[in-house]
Every structure is written in C-alpha cells, then in structure tokens.
Amino acid sequence: MKELNKKEKEYLLNSIRAIKDFPKPGIVFRDITTLLNDKEAFNFLMDHLTARYENFGIDFIAGIESRGFIFGAALAARLRLPFVPIRKPKKLPYITISQKYSLEYGVDEVQIHIDAFGEKEDARVLLIDDLIATGGTAKASVELIDQTKAKCVEACFLIDLKELGGSGTLKKLTKIYSVLEI
C-alpha cells in the first residue's frame, strides 16, 4: 500500500486550518472544513484512501458521527461499498445496540442499528473518522462493531494527535492507519 511522502503530507496538513484556543485556551482545533472546501486537496485525500483500501477485502465502511460520515460516505461511494453510520444516542430510528465510554467528566455512548451489517457473518469493517485524540469514541465504536459479530479490520483517521495517546490505546483492538500524525 502506497504511503504518502513528506511533501504530500505537508500539502494535506496545509489544507487544514489550525485554530488556537478553540474550544478553550490551550487547544489547537484542526478545522477540516478548509480541506473540504479545497477540491484538489479533498480529491487527493480520497484518491489516496481509495488506493489504500480498494483491495483490502472490506465489506462495509463505518463512520463515526459526524465528520467520519463525510470521509466514510465518500470512500464508500468510491469503493462501491455500503456505509454504516455510528451515531450518538437517540439518532437512529430502528432497534439499536449501544456501547458506553468514559469522558473526562462523565459517560457518553455510541449506537448502531442492530442489523447494520446485514446477514453477513464476520463482515470486514473499516472504521473511519477525521481525528483520533484520546481514542474513547473510536474504542467504543470498535467494541460496538464487535458486538454485531462483525470485525473491524482497520481504523482510519485523517489526523492522529499522537500526544493524547488514543492510537496507542486503540491499536490493542485493531490495526490503525492515520494519514497525518501531529
């Protein structure tokens, strides 16, 4: 699988706006809307992900709410695969299963339709989101996929905030690919 070189990574990184002190002092928020507004950068990213995953043997792509929907649905369309949304509670209309996870000050959860991966036994799922920080949501999403008897074969992120340790935690459950590491 082709990896991006330093120049290609810099190109993508430069297409993402960094906003200091948002949502609170000391945080640098990575605003992907500028990448989405740049058709060349967005298509470059999607071409890269398509090349990486076109022969990966994936049955489904699952995206984490909400920015994982953008990249996941776009990649699923390119690969002609079904897309499965992993959502916050009470957003899905049919019967769901849930996985709780801890936040700094509380608990949250993610949900998926009970039949999200259809009748396929051991469905191979690619999980995708824009960013991994502490990894709580991604870990819960992998555990949620496991509850359905499907298998998360890899978790893909546009950005890995390495210093927050999420990828280190998540790699105990599945393989990880991050386009950019910050």
Swiss-Prot record:
GO terms for cellular component: cytoplasm. It is found in: Cytoplasm. Homodimer. Catalyzes a salvage reaction resulting in the formation of AMP, that is energically less costly than de novo synthesis. GO terms for molecular function: adenine phosphoribosyltransferase activity. Keywords: Cytoplasm, Glycosyltransferase, Purine salvage, Transferase. It comes from Campylobacter curvus (strain 525.92). SUPFAM superfamilies: PRTase-like. Belongs to the purine/pyrimidine phosphoribosyltransferase family. It catalyses: AMP + diphosphate = 5-phospho-alpha-D-ribose 1-diphosphate + adenine. GO terms for biological process: adenine salvage; AMP salvage; purine ribonucleoside salvage. It comes from the Bacteria. This is Adenine phosphoribosyltransferase. Pathway: Purine metabolism; AMP biosynthesis via salvage pathway; AMP from adenine: step 1/1. Its main location: cytoplasm. It is an enzyme of class 2 (transferase). Its EC number is 2.4.2.7.
